[in-house]
């Protein structure tokens, strides 16, 4: 009897030992994961990467602000000293860069669970364990505080006031990817609104802000355009995990959709340039170059090859840089040097034609 009763106890003890060993293994594995996460931790680098300071992405927010300043100067026939000119450029650059840092950090905080499931984004600081969630939240709070302070200090009250809708909308954007098919249509106006602080930084008030609306719409269309291209890199992963985007929605009609957006950009940019009295320099090196880039982007994008999406996205960053350089040159020549660019270009062309004709005549006579 004793032996029969003892057997179940032995089996029970064996089960308890097995369960105990399993629990220890799970605990050990959990500790190993925690140790591995801590070993990867590099909070300063994590803050930098969350803020995208290691990339050129912040320029995408700076560009519209500089464009707005340039167009505002043309509309208001402003005159700048070299120092005031540089002050306007610096104010727009620093305020937009800090804001971009804050909201990229916020975006990664919200997306941390999704990012770990996508091949391209699983190496981002939070899913990779480079920075803790607590540290990321602290970084966002500090960056947001700097955003408000620096915008007010450099752009003034009116400038900070027109930035406020951008800040509010930026906190909504990460959640839109879970709800609708078109988060790019939210991101477009958010970045496009950077035109308004640039405009106000030159105008000095909100009285003529409505004149900046066409450029705001052109920029918004451009942002939707390049962000849809960017999203083509993740179309397959996005479909698997349920993330929605225009790249998923228009996957089979991508080139037609992008061509439509490109046409809107050029039409609105041309309208804005005409209203703001832009010179032949802006028309030839700005509007025309932008227009020529659209078909080149479409030819370079292959939706079956995700890597081309990243390359065409980079092309758009460089295109934005080119347009910004043209705007700065336009702003400098017309508002600081007080040069009539159209007259200067006309005289230059006539002078070169005359020299060419003289050289041809001399060659024939010889």
From Swiss-Prot:
One of its GO terms (biological process) is terpenoid biosynthetic process. Disruption phenotype: Abolishes the production of arthrobotrisins A to D and asthrosporol A, and leads to the accumulation of 6-methylsalicylic acid, toluquinol and two new toluquinol glycosides. Shows substantial reduction in conidiation. Shows significantly increased ammonia levels in fungal mycelia. It is found in: Membrane. Its EC number is 2.5.1.-. The keyword Ubl conjugation does not apply. It is an enzyme of class 2 (transferase). Induction: Expression is down-regulated by the cluster-specific transcription factor AOL_s00215g275. Expression is also down-regulated by the HOG1-MAPK pathway downstream transcription factor MSN2. InterPro entries: Prenyltransferase (IPR039653), UbiA_prenyltransferase (IPR000537), UbiA_prenylTrfase_CS (IPR030470), UbiA_sf (IPR044878). Keywords: Glycoprotein, Magnesium, Membrane, Transferase, Transmembrane, Transmembrane helix. Its main location: membrane. It comes from the Eukaryota. Its cofactor is Mg(2+). Glycans are attached at residues 277, 352. One of its GO terms (molecular function) is transferase activity, transferring alkyl or aryl (other than methyl) groups. Pathway: Secondary metabolite biosynthesis; terpenoid biosynthesis. Residues 1-22 are annotated as: Disordered. It is a multi-pass membrane protein. Polyprenyl transferase; part of the gene cluster that mediates the biosynthesis of sesquiterpenyl epoxy-cyclohexenoids (SECs) such as anthrobotrisins and arthrosporols, metabolites that possess a novel hybrid carbon skeleton consisting of a polyketide-derived epoxycyclohexenol combined with a terpenoid-derived monocyclic sesquiterpenol substructure (PKS-PTS hybrid). The SEC pathway plays an important role for fungal soil colonization via decreasing fungal nematode-capturing ability. Belongs to the UbiA prenyltransferase family. This is Polyprenyl transferase AOL_s00215g276. The lineage of its organism: Eukaryota, Fungi, Dikarya, Ascomycota, Pezizomycotina.
């Amino acid at each position: 009897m004793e032996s029969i009763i003892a057997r179940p106890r032995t089996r029970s003890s064996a089960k308890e030992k097995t369960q105990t060993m399993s629990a220890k293994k799970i605990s050990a594995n959990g500790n190993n994961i925690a140790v591995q996460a801590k070993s990867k931790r590099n909070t300063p680098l994590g803050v930098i990467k969350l803020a995208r300071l290691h990339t050129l992405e912040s320029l995408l927010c700076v560009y519209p602000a500089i464009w707005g300043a340039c167009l505002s100067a043309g509309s208001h026939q402003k005159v700048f000293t070299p120092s005031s000119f540089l002050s306007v450029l610096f104010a727009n650059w620093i305020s937009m860069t800090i804001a971009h840092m804050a909201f990229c950090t916020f975006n990664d905080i919200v997306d941390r669970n999704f990012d770990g499931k996508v091949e391209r984004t699983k190496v981002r600081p939070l899913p990779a364990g480079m920075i803790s969630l607590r540290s990321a939240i602290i970084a966002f709070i500090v960056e947001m505080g700097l955003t408000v302070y620096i915008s007010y200090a450099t752009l003034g009250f009116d400038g900070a006031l027109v930035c406020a809708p951008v800040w509010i909308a930026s906190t909504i954007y990460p959640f839109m990817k879970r709800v609708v098919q078109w988060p790019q249509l939210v991101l477009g106006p958010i970045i496009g609104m950077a035109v308004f602080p640039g405009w106000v930084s030159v105008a000095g008030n909100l009285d003529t802000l409505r004149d900046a609306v066409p450029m705001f719409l052109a920029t918004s269309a451009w942002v939707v355009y390049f962000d849809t291209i960017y999203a083509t890199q993740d179309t397959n992963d996005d479909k698997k995990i349920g993330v929605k985007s225009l790249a998923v929605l228009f996957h089979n009609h991508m080139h037609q959709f992008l061509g439509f957006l490109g046409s809107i950009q050029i039409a609105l940019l041309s309208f804005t340039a005409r209203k703001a009295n832009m010179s032949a320099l802006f028309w030839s090196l700005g509007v025309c170059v932008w227009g020529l880039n659209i078909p080149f982007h479409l030819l370079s994008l292959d939706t079956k090859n995700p890597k081309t999406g990243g390359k065409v996205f980079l092309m758009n960053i460089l295109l934005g840089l080119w347009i910004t350089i043209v705007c700065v040159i336009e702003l400098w020549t017309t508002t600081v040097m007080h040069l009539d660019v159209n007259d200067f270009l006309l005289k230059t062309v006539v002078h070169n034609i005359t020299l060419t004709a003289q050289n041809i005549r001399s060659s024939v006579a010889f």
